[in-house]
């Protein structure tokens, strides 16, 4: 989960990373009030999860509270690379002597953590990597050892930070590592990390990506969810612990196991070529649990997608046997009642498949169509979606 800057700075404050005071708001009037409270010049910053805010006019210096009001009026509603500004961060402006770059990230290619540091901050780091690669240090981090102040100083030194700020920078870099590990992040980035005229080190910006797989360890992270930007169906699925991704097709997909669901998407897309270009409407993996409740929740999400014209349930029985899946489908249809109003093609295979098919056949639900193979099921679901 990508965070807004103001949310990243909340985590920075939690771990004592030095930054500038400020508050988030969604009105120009409140922006003025915050500037008055701070009592000094402020920065009015658009809160969007995309780079290039400054070039797009989304970051402005305000010498007075009235300036903050005017800038807030202009920035709210601004479209920055397809992201409409709905919130602003009003933060105390800082005198800047130098700008640096620091980040910690998960280096998937090398299966390790990576620190990146550069004396060339305040610009796109990709530009530095392309034009001045020798100015960008990449330092692997041993997960078993982490980053203490001594190693943080080494990171700063390799990033060519001036000798007179190495100690202060090391303290901040070590605290940023605490954010990275303590919050189960996959990215913590500060650009710029600034040196003030009196040699303070401040995180003026912040970018944090949290690992959703660690949400169970951080219930407090739920408050960071951007509900306005999240598809309501994906939000509903997440609330029910369903692994769901919305796509742009007409055939709803339910399967058990990510590999089977991915294969089902391919087979449905192929079958759809014969039926006016019908495509899969979603990815939905119910995993090993096909209880009535899980199946009902999955169907509820898919059937609430107005684009869906048919549903293909493709399950291979293993630990969860096919008869349990079939009972789950029957009970789910009972639970949903009239909300279940689209044809449901079901293909079962594997453990206790005959018993599962018999349960569905005996139920004789008017919406349920049985298929013997995945290809047959995909073709039938695509055909029904094209009617």
UniProtKB/Swiss-Prot annotation:
- EC number(s) per UniProt? 6.2.1.5
- According to its UniProt record, which reaction does this protein catalyse? succinate + ATP + CoA = succinyl-CoA + ADP + phosphate; GTP + succinate + CoA = succinyl-CoA + GDP + phosphate
What does the record note about the cofactor? Binds 1 Mg(2+) ion per subunit.
Q: Which residues bind substrate?
A: 256, 318-320
Gene Ontology MF terms in the entry: ATP binding; magnesium ion binding; succinate-CoA ligase (ADP-forming) activity; succinate-CoA ligase (GDP-forming) activity
Q: Where on the tree of life does the source sit, at the highest rank?
A: Bacteria
> Binding residues for Mg(2+), per the UniProt record?
191, 205
Record's GO cellular component terms:
cytosol; succinate-CoA ligase complex
For the biological process aspect of GO, one term held by this record is: succinyl-CoA metabolic process
The UniProt entry, under InterPro entries, shows: ATP-grasp, ATP-grasp_succ-CoA_synth-type, ATP_grasp_subdomain_1, Succ-CoA_synthase_bsu_CS, SUCC_ACL_C, Succ_CoA_ligase-like_bsu, Succinyl-CoA_synth-like
Q: Where is the ATP-grasp domain?
A: 9-236
Q: In which pathway does it act?
A: Carbohydrate metabolism; tricarboxylic acid cycle; succinate from succinyl-CoA (ligase route): step 1/1
Query: Which residues of this UniProt protein bind ATP?
Result: 45, 52-54, 94, 99
Which HAMAP family did the record assign?
A: Succ_CoA_beta
Record-stated family: Belongs to the succinate/malate CoA ligase beta subunit family.
What biological function has been recorded for the protein in this entry? Succinyl-CoA synthetase functions in the citric acid cycle (TCA), coupling the hydrolysis of succinyl-CoA to the synthesis of either ATP or GTP and thus represents the only step of substrate-level phosphorylation in the TCA. The beta subunit provides nucleotide specificity of the enzyme and binds the substrate succinate, while the binding sites for coenzyme A and phosphate are found in the alpha subunit.
**Assembly, per entry:** Heterotetramer of two alpha and two beta subunits.
Q: What is this protein called?
A: Succinate--CoA ligase [ADP-forming] subunit beta
Which species expresses this protein natively?
Mycobacterium sp. (strain KMS)
